[in-house]
């Protein structure tokens, strides 16, 4: 798959110590990067790395300075370079408020991938390494870390232009350090929470359960429908696609002469037409799982009352027919103790 880079620029953020205080500084490019095969390859790798990251959705609030500058650029009232420099200033101003503020290279790029226009923003770290030249001499060198990054956001410019009221045109990386990165990027962009994939997935699961219940399906029949739903969702996750509600409905049986999509709309679950899949939520369609107090359990839902029996009164599970490898471990270790 190819990527078409329209405009791209790099700016540098550095740190300095003034007295007892840390200060962030900027080194701004005065012109855009020339678009070369190397530049396009770098952006393709950044695009792919971003696709694989855990992301949250957001929308601009009414007072977003970033959105105002972006709109001026999109309306051709300013150039991309000018927009990028103002965005860098906003970023540094916001970043300086946080203890995790660090140096980095800021990448801003407008590109097209699969007929969709994007604006990508990321703060990349530099890594030190060694370089061997043509004379087999060793030199110190630095390279951009383009596979591992936590501070990044992307705007779907195509979706924003088609539907300004969309709640999913802006995404940002959640980050491994938790909520702080999320708050920081929300403040920098002047944004607030948009589509919540976790909530959407939970609503989808509830809709599927209710759809089966209103048709008075047996436990086995309901589980078969849920398994169909999971297989479709699993297929979408495997190819990096979202759950398409209409497409999902077409794979499910029609119950009480009403398709699932029609049922979900009628019952007002608030489901989006396209839902980002959340694996941890969807797996509950076919499995029971949990962990705590040194115990981790996971088993297929269809095994309830067949090989796995729950006694609510005694808060216990009885398992008949242990997995062979577990039984083998018990026999070897516990018999050895006796």
Curated annotation (Swiss-Prot):
HAMAP family: NdpA. One of its GO terms (cellular component) is cytoplasm. Disulfide bonds: none annotated. This is Nucleoid-associated protein PM1885. The keyword Cytoplasm applies. It is found in: Cytoplasm, Nucleoid. Its main location: cytoplasm. Keywords: Cytoplasm. GO terms for molecular function: double-stranded DNA binding; single-stranded RNA binding. It comes from the Bacteria. It comes from Pasteurella multocida (strain Pm70). Belongs to the YejK family.
